[in-house]
Amino acid sequence: MNSQPLRVGIGGPVGSGKTALTLALCRALRERYNIAVVTNDIYTQEDAQFLVRNEALEPERIIGVETGGCPHTAIREDASINLEAVEQLNRRFPGLDLIIVESGGDNLSATFSPELSDLTLYVIDVSAGDKLPRKGGPGICKSDLLVINKVDLAPMVGASLEVMERDTLKMRGDKPFVFSNQKIGQGLDEIIAFIERQGMLTAA
């Protein structure tokens, strides 16, 4: 049991696969760790409901936050609504190992407040085109791990994974990234290994 839960922030544009990754992480880690999730949506609790429907965790371990307005404000400038959800989960489940905080769909400039997230994963998807990594922004350049998702779509949208890799290396330097396809679990083991290593997670 860890004294304070590791808080992992998952950000990225709308439709990049954040909720699918959150679901995959919950399914892979829930037997080994004491986990809870906070999701952010602007006007609904759709992502939270998706996770409940797909039985990611018990419903009481998932809190859906309705941010209203601009989604990245709730994870950065005024993270109070998310910090309160994290506290609520800590009270509800003493001894949590891991809390995943999934942001609402945001733009490339969104980042997590250090108060809210210990580690940040930023998810982009190949269907947005192979020029996306070179556009930069804090999510692409500064996240702890960049997840380039939906690699299976590359041939359909004419995107080059080689170009994406080259530009990602240029934009991120030695910061890690992983190619992923959550439909078949590609990249998931690497993402989990990164979270465990960097977050110093140890199973009970």
UniProtKB/Swiss-Prot annotation:
GO biological processes: urea catabolic process
Principal localisation: cytoplasm
GO CC annotations, alphabetized: cytoplasm
Gene Ontology terms, MF aspect: GTP binding; GTPase activity; nickel cation binding
SUPFAM superfamilies in alphabetical order: P-loop containing nucleoside triphosphate hydrolases
Keywords from the named record: Chaperone, Cytoplasm, GTP-binding, Nickel insertion, Nucleotide-binding
NCBIfam families membership: ureG
Protein family membership: Belongs to the SIMIBI class G3E GTPase family. UreG subfamily.
Quaternary structure annotation from Swiss-Prot or TrEMBL: Homodimer. UreD, UreF and UreG form a complex that acts as a GTP-hydrolysis-dependent molecular chaperone, activating the urease apoprotein by helping to assemble the nickel containing metallocenter of UreC. The UreE protein probably delivers the nickel.
PANTHER family xref list: UREASE ACCESSORY PROTEIN G
Name by which UniProt lists this protein: Urease accessory protein UreG
Lineage: Bacteria, Pseudomonadati, Pseudomonadota, Gammaproteobacteria, Pseudomonadales
Gene name per UniProt: ureG
